[in-house]
């Protein structure tokens, strides 16, 4: 059992028959009354997100999640296909459950598949990935003063803010936790 006050982003627990992943968690002390935990959560099975509050002393069953190395094969219709690189077993995951992760990976990319018992519940991508710029505004000479950057669409459809000197066709290193530009590859 784990108390609500100990739940952090990325942890998974069971509540009301649902498998829930914590997206954001914060302590909140109102002017009057007791401390509460405000949380943004995702139902792992359905993909739906919701906000809720818990008392810090509420207890939940922590879910034991196992991960295995895998490779992203392809996406067809509403299903993404992955292969365990140790056993060569293939797994089908609904795109709705891994939509965010698919923005960071290309076919044949290495990932980790998350299991709850024998049920596939998600995918973990590397902390940084290398992606190519598909489309961005052209650079304007002498526009170095602003330093605000410009939006760039990458080959997976992800849109990130990049420095003005980045052009289409260049390979970039992207931080997957924050969805931000790190450097040129």
Curated annotation (Swiss-Prot):
Signal peptide: none annotated. Pathway: Protein biosynthesis; polypeptide chain elongation. Its main location: cytoplasm. The lineage of its organism: Bacteria, Bacillati, Bacillota, Bacilli, Lactobacillales. SUPFAM superfamilies: Nucleic acid-binding proteins (SSF50249), Translation proteins SH3-like domain (SSF50104). It is found in: Cytoplasm. GO terms for biological process: peptide biosynthetic process. One of its GO terms (molecular function) is translation elongation factor activity. One of its GO terms (cellular component) is cytoplasm. This is Elongation factor P. Coiled coil: none annotated. InterPro entries: Elong-fact-P_C (IPR015365), NA-bd_OB-fold (IPR012340), Rib_uL2_dom2 (IPR014722), Transl_elong_fac_P/YeiP (IPR020599), Transl_elong_KOW-like (IPR013185), Transl_elong_P/YeiP_cen (IPR001059), Transl_elong_P/YeiP_CS (IPR013852), Transl_elongation_fac_P (IPR011768). The gene is efp. Pfam families: EFP, EFP_N, Elong-fact-P_C. Keywords: Cytoplasm, Elongation factor, Protein biosynthesis. NCBIfam families: efp, PRK00529.1. Gene3D superfamilies: 2.30.30.30, Nucleic acid-binding proteins. Involved in peptide bond synthesis. Stimulates efficient translation and peptide-bond synthesis on native or reconstituted 70S ribosomes in vitro. Probably functions indirectly by altering the affinity of the ribosome for aminoacyl-tRNA, thus increasing their reactivity as acceptors for peptidyl transferase. It comes from Streptococcus pyogenes serotype M1. Belongs to the elongation factor P family.
């Amino acid at each position: 059992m784990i108390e609500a006050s100990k739940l952090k982003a990325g942890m998974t627990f069971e509540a009301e028959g649902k498998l829930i992943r914590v997206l954001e968690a914060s302590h909140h002390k109102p002017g009057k009354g007791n401390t509460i935990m405000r949380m943004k959560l995702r139902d792992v099975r359905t993909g739906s997100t919701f906000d809720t509050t818990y008392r810090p002393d509420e207890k939940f069953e922590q879910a034991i999640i196992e991960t295995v190395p895998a490779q992203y094969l392809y996406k067809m219709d509403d299903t993404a296909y992955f292969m365990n690189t140790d056993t060569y077993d293939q797994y089908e995951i609904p795109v709705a459950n891994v939509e965010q992760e698919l923005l960071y990976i290309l076919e044949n990319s290495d990932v980790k598949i998350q299991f709850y018992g024998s049920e596939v519940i998600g995918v973990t991508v590397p902390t940084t990935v290398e992606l190519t710029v598909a489309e961005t505004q052209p650079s304007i000479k002498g526009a170095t003063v602003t330093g605000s950057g410009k939006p760039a669409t990458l080959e997976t459809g992800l849109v990130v803010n990049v420095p003005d000197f980045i052009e289409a066709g260049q390979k970039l290193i992207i931080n997957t936790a924050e969805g931000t530009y790190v450097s040129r590859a």
